[in-house]
């Protein structure tokens, strides 16, 4: 990463007091000015601009300073120790909401139960519950801080109809509080590989966000296939690279039973990066969801039980 020039620091100092302190994180004057604007408009009343700029100079994430992050129609409270919602996650969650609201399910108000694993702030579960009619949810996380923050976000955003479960999803023993059946399973698991964490991740993330919610290999996707697929009609799991999609696809295609009943797709984000592995089971509701999400991404494996049906499959 190139060093910030002395001339740029001087220029920023002349524009606004403390603006130059934002440059190490923002990198450009334009981004620093935008962030300074957000700070002046949204900073909690008990904090000063000078304090906020100094915090950013120390690489404290903006969302922890402002204490919130917009996510769809919601304003999600953010606190240290819990992963900050990302735009990449918001993008695919909003795509789910749009697809469901434009479908027959919205017209007939068919009930849906959503289970959100690795819930963090609860942004996925709460956004789906808020945006979809006749929807209930279960949100699961191992972190006490996360579960407390989900409760706070439910109150702030006036979202009800949810059950919170504190449990380690990767534990060999399942919780009795898990739902017995799920219509839509969602998750943003820790997926940054250890080899990539120090090299690719921003300083602010490495210093201040919980490593537990960031770093992972394939364990969460192994858990998805081994434990969750029998319980759900569909799933949407965020990924960090196409290798994680390939693992899930391979496990399903190489299993004669799973390959018969599961269709698997891949969604890229607006930056052209592999972002979501998703799938639909060949059950009555799973088939409906498959039709609803026909344009969500690209189906890469079609369930052999549906091989006689027309589908968008590469």
UniProtKB/Swiss-Prot annotation:
SUPFAM superfamilies: S-adenosyl-L-methionine-dependent methyltransferases. One of its GO terms (biological process) is translational termination. Keywords: Methyltransferase, Mitochondrion, S-adenosyl-L-methionine, Transferase. Pfam families: MTS (PF05175). One of its GO terms (cellular component) is mitochondrion. S-adenosyl-L-methionine binds at residues 118-122, 141, 188. It is found in: Mitochondrion. Substrate binds at residues 188-191. InterPro entries: HemK-like (IPR004556), N5-glutamine_MTase (IPR050320), SAM-dependent_MTases_sf (IPR029063), Small_mtfrase_dom (IPR007848). Its EC number is 2.1.1.297. GO terms for molecular function: protein-(glutamine-N5) methyltransferase activity; protein-glutamine N-methyltransferase activity; S-adenosylmethionine-dependent methyltransferase activity. It is an enzyme of class 2 (transferase). It catalyses: L-glutaminyl-[peptide chain release factor] + S-adenosyl-L-methionine = N(5)-methyl-L-glutaminyl-[peptide chain release factor] + S-adenosyl-L-homocysteine + H(+). Methylates MRF1 on 'Gln-287' using S-adenosyl L-methionine as methyl donor. Belongs to the protein N5-glutamine methyltransferase family. Present with 13200 molecules/cell in log phase SD medium. This is Mitochondrial MRF1 N(5)-glutamine methyltransferase MTQ1. It comes from Saccharomyces cerevisiae (strain ATCC 204508 / S288c).
């Amino acid at each position: 990463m190139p060093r910030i020039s002395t001339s740029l620091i001087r220029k920023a100092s002349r524009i606004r007091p403390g603006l130059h302190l934002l440059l190490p994180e923002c990198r450009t004057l334009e981004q620093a000015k935008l962030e300074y604007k957000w700070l002046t408009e949204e900073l909690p009343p008990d904090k000063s601009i000078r304090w906020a700029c100094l915090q950013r100079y120390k690489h404290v994430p903006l969302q922890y300073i402002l204490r919130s992050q917009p996510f769809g129609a919601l304003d999600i409270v953010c606190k240290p120790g819990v992963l900050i919602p990302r735009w990449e996650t918001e993008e695919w969650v909003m795509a789910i909401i749009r697809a469901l609201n434009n479908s027959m399910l919205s017209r007939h108000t068919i009930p849906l139960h959503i289970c959100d694993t690795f819930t963090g702030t609860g942004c996925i579960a709460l956004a789906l519950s808020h945006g979809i009619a006749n929807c209930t949810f279960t949100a699961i996380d191992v972190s006490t801080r996360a579960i407390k923050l989900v409760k706070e976000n439910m109150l702030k955003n006036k979202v009800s109809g949810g059950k919170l479960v504190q449990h380690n999803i990767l534990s060999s023993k399942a919780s009795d509080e898990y739902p017995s059946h799920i219509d839509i399973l969602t998750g943003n698991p820790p997926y940054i590989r250890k080899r990539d964490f120090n090299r690719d991740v921003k300083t602010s993330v490495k210093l201040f966000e919980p490593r537990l919610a960031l770093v992972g290999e394939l364990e969460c996707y192994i858990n998805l296939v081994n434990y969750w697929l029998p319980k759900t009609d569909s799933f949407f799991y965020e990924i960090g690279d196409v290798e994680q999609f390939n693992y899930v696809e391979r496990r399903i295609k190489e299993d004669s039973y799973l390959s018969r009943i599961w269709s698997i797709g891949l969604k890229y984000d607006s930056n052209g990066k592999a972002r979501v592995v998703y799938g639909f089971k060949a059950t009555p509701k799973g088939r409906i969801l498959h039709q609803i999400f026909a344009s969500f991404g690209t189906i890469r494996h079609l369930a052999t039980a549906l091989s006689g049906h027309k589908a968008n499959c590469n």
